[in-house]
Structure formats: C-alpha cells, structure tokens
Amino acid sequence: MLRKTLLVVAENFMKLLNYYRRFVATLFGFILFGVVGVLFKIVLLPYTLNGTQNDIPRQMQARRLIGRVWKWFAGYLVWSGVLTVRFNGLEKLGRPGQLVLANHPSLLDVVLLIGHVPQMNCIVKKDLLNNPSMKSQILATGYIPNDESLEMMEEVDAVFKSGQSLLIFPEGTRTGWDGQIKLHRGAVSIGLRSARVITPVCIKMNPPNFKKGQPWYKIPPRTIHYEITVGDDIHPQDWLAEKPLPIAARRLNIYLQDYFTRETT
C-alpha cells in the first residue's frame, strides 16, 4: 500500500515538474519570438532600405534567411518539450505556380510551414504592416498584404506567372476553440483563376493552444503535438470544366471546408 502511494506521489510530482518546465520554456519562447522580431528589423535593413519589389532573387534570399531562423525557433520549442511536430508529404510543397491552402489552428502555423518551406510567398493580414517587427519581414520577402484590392490580385497573378508558390490561410484568422472551420471563398477563387495546382495542407494539433487572444501562460497539461499533412493536388481545370468560376469556387470552397473539418476531427 505504501509503495503504491509513493508511486502515485512520484508520478504527480513528475507531472508537476513537467508542467513548470514547459511553462518556463513557453515563457522563454515568447521572449525569443519578440527578440527575433526586433533583430529582423535590423538584419533585414539591406532589403528594406533598398526595396525588393519585383526583385525575386533578393526576396528569395530574405525568405531563406527568415525561414532558417523560424526553423531554428521551432526546433527550440521541440527541444524544450513545448511541442512535437510531424510532417507528412512536405516535399510536395513549394512547386512553381502552386497555391497552398492551409487551415489555421494556432499562432505557430506560419512559423512551422515557412520554417520548412521558406521559398513560398504568402498572403498576410494587412494589419501586420502596423507591427514594426513584422513589417520588415513583409517588405523584405515580398509577402502580399491582404487588402482585397485589384492591385493585390495583380500581385497574386504575377507571383504565379513568375513561378513562385503561394501560401494562404483561407480562414482569415485562427480557428476558434470550437474547432469550426469556415473558409473565405476568395482564396479558392484565386486558385481557380491563377494557380497551376491547388494543394491543401491539414494542420492538426492536440491539445489546442496558441489561440487568438489566449494568454501565453495558459499552457495545456501536456506537450502539444502537431501533425501537418499535405493533401492531394487539386487541378483547377477539373473544377472549371463544367461550371463557370463563381459556381466552381463555391463548390470547391464547400469541398475544402468539409475536407479540413473531416481531417481535423
């Protein structure tokens, strides 16, 4: 009886120790996240001062630099026990003319994808241009702020015509705690109109964390596990063969919404 009690006490102590270890590692991770953002503002000065607009080689240099840093940051989070991550089919990303559509369960989705496939361009929230640390990264890499303007659509067309791949999170914001995935049709319309191929990427995480508005100190009781799976290609011409763009976009949007919901539950 005493032995059983001691084992329970020891197990609870180890759980508590693991919790506080991850708590400290998460705190340090957020500090690193902020410090890296400030350092980027300095390191990327050669790109932001001279500009990289229409200069794809220099944009790619900046993306590789940022990708290496975010891959290192993700590596720290894995090493410290904050999370684990498993990739399936990552080699299928980054192809010319490819639109990558991913669901968006957490803050770290961009970090994990860009850290491992840095050559992708990305549509980002326009509000991020008001964030000093993020503005430098957006300007240096040629990422496209989402203002839903005609100029933005022309930039997207130019991205695909130049042989780049493009990452979009069609939810527009992080998935809520209820797990309901709602996609904006605009991302699908972009793919049907301009991309050579559309590739869905399903991001699963358990337990949920790093949600919008969530305090950093609200960490889960165990290590977070990410599984990022690249789905099968979707060919725009197959969806446009029988229906005009608006109807095809609506149908594909419903299909993808069902796909992400099914794959994440």
Residue map of PLM features:
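Catalytic core of membrane glycerolipid acyltransferases/transacylases, capturing the structured
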Residues: 44-68, 79-80, 94-148
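Membrane-anchoring hydrophobic helices of lipid-metabolizing enzymes
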Residues: 6-98
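Alpha-helical membrane-embedding segments
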Residues: 85-101, 133, 155-158, 198
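A generic structural signal for well-ordered alpha-helical segments
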Residues: 77-78, 138, 159, 191
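Non-catalytic C-terminal accessory region of glycerolipid acyltransferases
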Residues: 5, 9-13, 23, 150-265
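A generic structural signal for alpha->beta connector loops
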Residues: 82-84, 119, 140, 163, ...
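Short gly/ser/thr-rich secondary-structure transition/capping motifs
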Residues: 79-87, 146-150, 210-213
